[in-house]
């Protein structure tokens, strides 16, 4: 099992606890991950962290594909990977219609098609075997639209080839997981109860079979929040707030992938109730409606001994090959030390 830490989204003011990251690096954590939504970006913090660390890998979880061309992302990845001596990891996501069309001002389109095209183009750029040409639904290289000049020509990156860069995608739907298995090196399934790995693995393996690979060549990397404390309800509340936001409000009523995912995990009634409350403006009630069982299944909360006991289940999931990494969200130094002590 590899361990990573989540740097998380910045609020109104971006901040990075570099001492926490350096401490994790010294404990043996393998990676740290930055994020973006519609405020601070994921790349700038990643570059900053890479400049202030020596061994730990730094990835994006995630960069929104509709916000950048594949060539832009490939150039960014190759640049950071060179400057950091091979420590950068690309994490991509399709985002959702509300952000893509509301923030980036482009059509949401076909997310699975976009993912396949995007990664195909990036890998061509990384390989630098020939000038890049691609004509697909989302991307045209060289551009062949009627509003173009017709002067574009196929190009190769000026940087040296680098096929070592790993690409992860964020996915929780069956099609998204299958696509990730087909074209990516790993997946962020946001939260994942280790006992219910089969909900995801079947779709991933379908994709892996299309690319002639097996699960041992692929990394399933769920996000796991760790909160140590004697008061279970107090530990659960911030996690419930986050889960209520995603299950209830991260998307329209009829197109919320996180709501669908909660249903697939067996929490259909709760998912419906959370969304109804959240979209009615009753956010506190939506938070309270998140089942304790869902929090406990996906995250690590409570006294130290309770967390240690629960970590045994994660170890079993790792041994079975269903989970390759745990990406830890923890503000407590003690929590990072606890997980490292048990898992590394």
Regions found by a protein language model. Give the residues of each.
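Active-site-adjacent structural elements that line small-molecule/cofactor binding pockets in enzymes
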Residues: 1-344
